[in-house]
UniProtKB/Swiss-Prot annotation:
Name of the protein: Small ribosomal subunit protein uS11
This protein's encoding gene: rpsK
Family, as annotated: Belongs to the universal ribosomal protein uS11 family.
Matches recorded under NCBIfam families: PRK05309.1 (NF003698), uS11_bact (TIGR03632)
Keyword rRNA-binding included in the entry's annotation: yes
Lineage top rank: taxon: Bacteria
Keywords tagged on the record: Ribonucleoprotein, Ribosomal protein, RNA-binding, rRNA-binding
Subunit composition and interactions: Part of the 30S ribosomal subunit. Interacts with proteins S7 and S18. Binds to IF-3.
Main function: Located on the platform of the 30S subunit, it bridges several disparate RNA helices of the 16S rRNA. Forms part of the Shine-Dalgarno cleft in the 70S ribosome.
InterPro entries, sorted: Ribosomal_uS11, Ribosomal_uS11_bac-type, Ribosomal_uS11_CS, Ribosomal_uS11_sf
GO biological process, one term: translation
Any one GO molecular-function label of the UniProt entry: rRNA binding
One Pfam entry name: Ribosomal_S11
Length: 130
């Protein structure tokens, strides 16, 4: 007779997090939306590329809206009610991502622009000639 191995699995307890932080990184090529708790522990992330957009369609405001909506709906399971939004970068999906998070049903407590601005640091790249 062979021994039967018994595998014990622990049930994952869903944490209840009432408020969190939505980090929106909007570059010229893509938009990354990460939703964390107050301590910075990542709960869910989504990008324009992961939402099914490829190439030049990744950098559109609609792609950023879809990515933020997808991330917002995934975190509703935690019982989150309000979000603080931190926007980073100069991309075209900045405002549409914030608007879609509020349309999902979150109360936006405050919006902070955390884009790093140099005090005349590095020399910028040369101008494109097309």
């Amino acid at each position: 007779m062979s021994k039967q191995s018994v595998v014990k699995t622990k049930k994952r307890v869903k944490r209840v997090i009432t408020d969190g932080v939505a980090h929106i990184c909007a570059s010229f090529n893509n938009t990354i939306v990460t939703i964390t708790d107050r301590q910075g522990n990542s709960l869910f992330w989504c990008t324009s590329g992961a939402s099914g957009f490829r190439g030049s369609r990744k950098c559109t405001p609609f792609a950023a809206q879809v990515a933020a909506e997808k991330a917002g709906r995934a975190v509703l399971d935690y019982g989150m009610k309000s979000l603080e939004v931190r926007i980073n970068g100069p991309g075209p999906g900045r405002e549409s991502a914030v608007r879609s998070l509020s349309n999902v049903g979150y109360k936006i407590t405050n919006i902070i622009d955390v884009t790093p601005i140099p005090h005349n640091g590095c020399r910028p790249p040369k101008k494109r000639r097309v």
